Amino acid sequence: MLGVLALVIALVAIVSGGGGGSGEKTSTRARSGATPARPGARSTSAAYRRESRAITRVLGYTPFVARGSPRKREVALTIDDGPGPLTSRFVRTLRHLHAPATFFIVGQQLNSFGAGLREEIRAGFAIGDHTEQHQTLTQLRPGLQSKAIQDAALRIRSYGIPYPRLFRPPGGFFNAATMAALREHRMLAVLWTVDTQDFTRPGARAIMQRAVDGARNGAIILLHDGGGDRTQTLAALPAIIHRLRARGFQLVTVPQMLLHDPPSKRQARPISHGA
């Protein structure tokens, strides 16, 4: 597939760990954090509109982001594969610690755990699309890729928030057809800098250590609240937040990072990745 070798070399420099996705579905990764928006306010606030414009600006020069620029000491926690049975506890922990996060939603999970998305919205967290059924997109025809993205996006919008502008490909797998679908839906692909590999359940301490050791200015950290037993990730979350702040990092959402400290225009532009 066109550009696979060049892309893999480029992504090795920006995506650590090579993982990224629940083990069940994929083969594949401040002194004070910014406080999330007031409950229920994000979708209509001036801040939301500024962040949406920032996403549009970034889309003007790249279809993906795997980190912000290194200028600011900011990191973004991203949480995938939910909502799930522990999502409410993730939300409560983040709110208690005034820690922003970006949740990437699997559409079919809303059948059983829609209350989790409602809590994320009320807390003012950023919301992205993670496909309808956590499909490996490179195994789908182009039209089915677009449908997998759109079906989840429409479900998310039905909860009273705007159509999502951010998308994370399950397992990090994408190809030229994925990028074409994202252009159609005006979405930015969000990869990651630090893969905690929490889906392998290595223990809360190991998850925390990977998140903190891998953090650099502009890092996007990959965690999961769904797709399996996420008790270890939940247990690690407070220590991750405290230790990142002790190292002088400010926690932000992905849209906030794109507004404050967007990636360089010289970052590699992916053509395809995966099978």
Q: Could you describe each region identified by the protein language model?
A:
Residues M1-A76, S88, R92-T102, D213, ...:
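Terminal accessory/targeting
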Residues N111-S112, Q135-Q250, V254-I271:
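Catalytic domains of cell-wall/extracellular-matrix polysaccharide-remodeling enzymes
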Residues A46-S158, L259:
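Active-site beta->alpha N-cap acidic-glycine motif
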